[in-house]
Regions:
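Bacterial N-terminal signal peptides
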Residues: 4-15
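Conserved SAM-binding strand-loop segment of SAM-dependent methyltransferases
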Residues: 75-81
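N-terminal Rossmann-like dinucleotide-binding module
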Residues: 19-71
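Beta-strand-loop-alpha-helix segment that lines the small-molecule cofactor/substrate pocket
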Residues: 88, 93, 99-100, 104-151, ...
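Active-site loop of classical SDR/Rossmann-like NAD(P)-dependent oxidoreductases
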Residues: 36, 59-62, 307-319
Length: 368
């Protein structure tokens, strides 16, 4: 006789859970319009239910007007002053499309308002700035995430999964190719090109612009362990076009039992972002965003396959950011997390020093 009331209570509890509303879209503000990747965000926003755009901070009124017209944005969204926007709107997160040099300034300002940040790769231009960003995140208990296009490639996720599951045996060598024909050659806009080719505002040329991708992937593959040493060679093959920065680099990362070769360049004949992982018993090569070439121990020839799709909340930057802010994902040790990207900056900083001095740089432990 007591079973029926219990069943009724269980049914009511289940109905109540099912009736709970879905997570509301996160409120985001764009800070800066000088990084061309903002165009991808604005183009995708109307189809993305994870976020609501509440403000855009851009002091260049002509550039702000250009974007307002191109993307049919209300003038009420725009603000020329960062602090005023943070105070008046208090978004859940800021999406930072400034120069890389400006990342620290924006992140620290947002953190003081307990607002999280997502920046475009890389995290910063210097190790000092990276550590200052980490201090701000810790002090104010906010998230700082770094957006890489390749994070949302299912091919990379599958390659990392196979490596970490032992399917390839011990990973011995990783080769990463990233880049394109050059920013000027592909038509980067006038608001972007000057600072992208400035060693102060961008940190370096192709070395930072595309070297960060491989450093990010390798740091996750090595479970957050930094390399023992970094050796880098850079050069400028097109000095008339890029007189102040490198346009081609090769970086060797040495680990206790593995080696990575990163090949960032603005001199590729076409755009590419691919990775080769070689283990003791197999290899996997990523092809574009969702395909792989593989060969495992005992197989006589190479095979091709499509990577399984990513979970919905890890399929793009906005879905991921919303999942983090809603507490569904803890960004620890993944491609986007701050701890991973502190190591990425350690690698890039050492690579820049190595290229400048002609010496291999042995990495020292970072302050906690």
């Amino acid at each position: 006789m007591k079973l029926a009331p219990l069943l009724l209570l269980a049914t009511l509890a289940t109905s109540a859970l099912n009736a709970q509303p879905e997570n509301k879209p996160i409120r985001v503000a764009i800070v800066g319009l000088v990084h061309g990747h903002v165009k991808g965000f604005l183009a995708a926003l109307p189809k993305n239910a994870n976020a609501q755009l509440v403000a855009i901070v851009e002091p260049n009124t002509a550039l702000a007007q250009q974007y307002a017209s191109q993307y049919h944005l209300s003038q009420s969204l725009f603000d020329a002053d960062l602090e005023h926007m943070l105070t008046s709107q208090h978004p859940d997160a800021v999406l930072v499309y400034t120069t890389i040099k400006d990342h620290r300034r924006v992140i620290e300002a947002a953190a003081k308002h307990n607002i999280s940040s997502m920046v475009e790769k890389p995290l910063s231009t210097t190790m000092d700035d990276a550590l200052a960003i980490r201090r701000a995140a810790r002090e104010h208990h906010v998230q700082v995430l770094v957006n890489y296009e390749t994070t949302w490639y299912s091919s990379n996720a599958e390659a990392i999964s196979e490596a970490q599951s032992g399917k390839l045996g011990d990973v011995r060598k990783v080769v990463v190719h990233d880049g394109h024909e050059g920013p000027k050659e592909i038509g980067v806009g006038p608001e972007w090109l000057p600072w992208l080719t400035d060693p102060i505002q961008n940190g370096a040329g192709a070395l930072f612009d595309f070297g960060c991708y491989g450093a990010d992937l390798m740091t996750v593959l090595m479970h957050g362990q930094p390399p023992i040493s970094v050796t880098a060679v850079t050069q400028t093959d097109k000095p008339a076009t890029y007189p102040h920065v490198d346009d081609d680099a090769t970086v060797i990362l040495r680990y206790a039992n593995a080696q990575a070769v990163l090949m960032p360049s603005w001199d590729w004949p076409f755009a590419r972002k691919d990775m080769e992982l070689y283990g003791a018993t197999g290899y996997v090569i990523t092809v574009a965003s969702d395909n792989l070439r593989t060969r495992y121990h005992g197989e006589k020839s190479e095979s091709q396959k499509t990577a399984p799709p990513l979970p919905e909340n890890e399929s793009n930057s906005l879905a991921y950011l919303a999942a983090v802010l809603h507490g569904e994902i803890k960004p620890q040790g993944d491609l986007t997390s701050l701890d991973t990207n502190i190591i990425v900056m350690q690698i890039l900083d050492a690579a820049r020093t190595s290229a400048k001095t002609g010496r291999t740089i042995e990495l020292k432990p970072l302050p906690e």
